[in-house]
Amino acid sequence: MSEETQYEYLVPLEKYLSAGVRLGTRLSNKYLEERGFIYAVRPDGLRIFDIKKIDERLRIAAKFISRYQPDRILVHTTRPYGFKPVQMFCKFVGCRALTGRFIPGTLTNPYLPNYTEIDLLFVVDPKLDAQAVAEAAKMGIPIIALVDTDTPHQYIDFMIPCNNKGRRSLALIFWILARQVLRERGELKPDQDLPVPPEEFETRLIQ
């Protein structure tokens, strides 16, 4: 039996595949390549992530997040497909959600009405969420980020390699993380799932 067969994923491998979690872009970050996150390159140039490494990083990220007070964690995204996953994650985990525009000074200017003091920042895309990343770095706040194959890694303390652009991918990633954080905190049993399926974390398409 191969090591790949023996490894027990957080969700069935087919779920990762059908959600497109491992699909990257045609651009590649050498930093990610050197760390073995990028598994292969398709004939059309699309980079493919190593699903096992995604799974391993999700486990570690959940342990890391579970050590913080929920209300001292800010999860931010400016990507519309990330709005619902982030809001659902924060609903279950108890942390703060900031979707849409990040007002400059939110983490650095105490005179702003929306000034927020946090101990951990979690962003969906460091490229799009660059303002939040820059402010957290300036304040010495640890940063967790979902990173695609073309994502800059500067200032990121912990990276979760994955497709951070797809609607279904983001839903599954945040569903897994929410479940794992609650398991780590003892609020769910080790084999217990969330009361809603990953589809409930998906941003709905307007017909």
From Swiss-Prot:
Gene3D superfamilies: Glucose-6-phosphate isomerase like protein, domain 1 (3.40.50.10490). One of its GO terms (biological process) is translation. GO terms for molecular function: structural constituent of ribosome. It comes from the Archaea. Signal peptide: none annotated. GO terms for cellular component: small ribosomal subunit. Keywords: Ribonucleoprotein, Ribosomal protein. Belongs to the universal ribosomal protein uS2 family. This is Small ribosomal subunit protein uS2. It comes from Pyrobaculum islandicum (strain DSM 4184 / JCM 9189 / GEO3).
